[in-house]
Each structure stands twice: as C-alpha cells, then as structure tokens.
Amino acid sequence: VVVDAVGHGLLTLDDLERSHVRGFDFEAAWRAVEPDDVVTLIYTSGTTGPPKAVQLTHASVLFECRALQACLPYQSGGRMISYLPSAHVGDRVLVHYGASICFGQSVVSVADLRQIAAAMVEVRPTVFGGVPRVWEKLKAGLEAAGLRDPSQLPEAGKALVRARLGLDHCTLCVSGAAPAAMEVMQYFSGLGLSLNEGWGMSELSCFATVNPPGDIRMGSVGKALPGVELRLLDDGELLVRAPLVMKGYRDDPQRTAETLDADGWLHSGDIATIDGDGYVRIVDRKKELIINS
C-alpha cells in the first residue's frame, strides 16, 4: 500500500479506504486483537544486507511509549513535528503512535524537508527530535549567522535565539539513530537546549536507553528505560531483554534466531560499556556499519 504514488501492482491508500470487503465486521475485528498481535512492520536492513521485516506488537509499542512517558517530559497537549520518513521507527512509533495516540499531542506532518525550519517557528514544538545530521545543520545555520559560541550570550539573548529557532517552548530535545558529535551537544547545551541522546533500534520498538532529564551525561546514550534489562557479553556486545523487543523478523526464522536467543535476549551487534551508575556508552560495532543520518 502506498500513500502518494500510483503504478502497476500498487494499491493506493485512497483505494484501500474506498474498498469494501463483503462480510467484514470491523467491530468484531478490533475487539479480537490481542496484545501479542503484530501492529506494524518496520523494514530494516540492519545497516547492510537484504531487508528484514521487524514485527512490532501492540504490547511492545505500548511498553515503549509508557516507559518513555515515565522518564521524559511528554505532556498531554504538547506539539511535535513529523518529518522523518514514516518507514523510520522513530517517526512511526514515537511520533504517530506515541505522541498522537498515547500522549494526546498534536502532530504536524511536514513532507518537504526544506520547510522544517519554517515549520518549527510556526508549530513551536514542545518535543523535537532528530538524527545528528539535523542538529548539525541547525548548528551550521546559526554559525553562518555569526553565532559561534552561544554559551557567551546573556540569558535573554539565548531565549531570543531559541524563539527564532521555534524551540522556545521545547521541553525535550532528542537526538538518536547515531552518535552525536560532542561539539554539537555542547553547542546546544550552551544555548540552553540540552540534547537528550538515546539508543535503540527498530527491533526494540525504538529507544531502549535515554539520558534522564536533569542528569544528562554527554557522550553516553543514557540509562535503560524502566523495565528494560541490559547485559554485556564478554566481547562487550550489548544485549537487551524487555517487553519492547520485537516478536521476530516476519517469515525469517533463521535471522530471528541469530538476533533473539532462547532466553529472550536481543543481540544488538553494538559494543558498549556500562558504568557504575548505569550509563551506557556505545564504543564500536560488532558487525556491519553505523548509519549517521
């Protein structure tokens, strides 16, 4: 099913909505849904290789949303911008399922990435997230305008810059999907916008770790979400066990078994360290590549 294209062999969303299946009972169908039923498929290559269809369930997505809500300032009535591809687990799960359905926030969708800056000023999001490349571009734009070191501005000046960015109402700035450069983190911290870096993957319904607000440690991806277990193998590979772990790869038992062991631990492929306070740092990749934008 495609949203905004037509072609041979494609079913458009409009056609799907207009279709009628004889004898289909919507009321009975939705009431028959169980927590372990698949709610969505996220296609991922795991950075390289043939695509895999990650099966996320109603239970795994709800666990992810509730765990994030327990430790981050997601307030009802807030505002978010959807601009990442909906194939991205962050946009689909955190924005459309989490912010809109679970948290009761308004979501404004922006199809043209060139309009993001204008949308930020118009929407004034209360939560704004992006991959590191987004934050790098915002930093580059401010530097091009002459703001080399925002930490030297008086508080009134910082507030003015935040307002011009459209982030003056933002209580949570998130960076994820790849490591953010330290200079980017420090730049926005100097502006009064602490980037909350987290770690996760499609197979984990998005985030498994985040930095606690008020206790952000730059260079780390934070601590495990409530209810999430972390473990390191002897080679440093980070393993995760929690209700947010995927059901498996659709119709691919071999690769499912390679990722999920018999005890329910998901093998992430990332090499990490965990300090005495529970903060995780990703230091290497056991296999494949890290995507940074």
Protein language model features and the residues they cover:
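Conserved S/T- and glycine-rich ATP-binding loop of Class I adenylate-forming
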Residues: V38, T44-T47, M80, P85, ...
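Conserved AMP-binding A3 loop
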Residues: V39-F63
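Conserved ATP-binding/catalytic segment of the ANL
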Residues: A224-N292
